[in-house]
């Protein structure tokens, strides 16, 4: 006669632990495999904007990033940004600089295109339109989501490259030309550093 063996308390605890560990491991794997899993993708066609002419949409792997531009703050810089957007110049432009939890930068139209990357020069390219003068924004506050034009170490060297900050940066105020602020989809940018697709992470800091 076969006797039914009862599991001891310690065996039950081990069994429950292994099951829990398995579920946790599977969940972690699925999340790591798809970093966009919990990121909301905003459809600009379903959002009513007060001034649609001052709205820019960036298409990133995890979804759309919607930016409100501020022509009253930096008129010439915003016009340059709009000109490049209208001509689709930013299409296939890689995020070549990513500082985790601080900022992402893109817009190198000469060396930073995904289909024509130059790893030795990326970040130094131009648009072909020439540089423009800095517009340092007066009382503009560089709070989380603000968008500014990148430049060299000197003022009046802004061109096509832009950055978006992921945290408040008061030290940027009066130093970099602001062009707008992300109003939807900032969480999309926070996922860039973790994507395995290297077209988005070329020289992470």
Residue ranges and their predicted role:
Residues 1-205:
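Cyclophilin-like peptidyl-prolyl cis-trans isomerases
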């Amino acid at each position: 006669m076969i006797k039914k063996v009862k599991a001891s308390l310690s065996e039950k605890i081990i069994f429950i632990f292994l099951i829990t560990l398995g579920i946790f491991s599977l969940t972690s794997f699925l999340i790591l495999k798809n970093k966009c899993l919990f990121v909301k993708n905003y459809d600009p066609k379903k959002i009513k904007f007060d001034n649609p002419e001052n709205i820019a949409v960036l298409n990133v792997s995890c979804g759309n990033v919607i930016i409100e531009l501020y022509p009253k703050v930096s008129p010439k810089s915003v016009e340059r940004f709009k000109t490049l957007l209208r001509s689709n110049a930013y299409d296939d432009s890689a995020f070549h600089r990513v500082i985790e939890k601080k900022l992402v930068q893109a817009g190198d139209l000469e060396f930073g295109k995904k289909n024509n990357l130059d790893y030795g020069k990326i970040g130094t390219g131009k648009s072909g339109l020439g540089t423009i003068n800095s517009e340092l924004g007066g009382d503009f506050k560089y709070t989380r989501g603000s968008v500014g034009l990148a430049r060299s170490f000197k003022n009046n060297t802004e061109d096509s490259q832009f950055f978006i900050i992921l945290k408040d940066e008061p030290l940027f105020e009066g130093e970099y030309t602001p062009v707008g602020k992300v109003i939807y989809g900032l969480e999309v940018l926070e996922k860039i550093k973790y994507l395995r697709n290297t077209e988005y992470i070329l020289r992470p800091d």
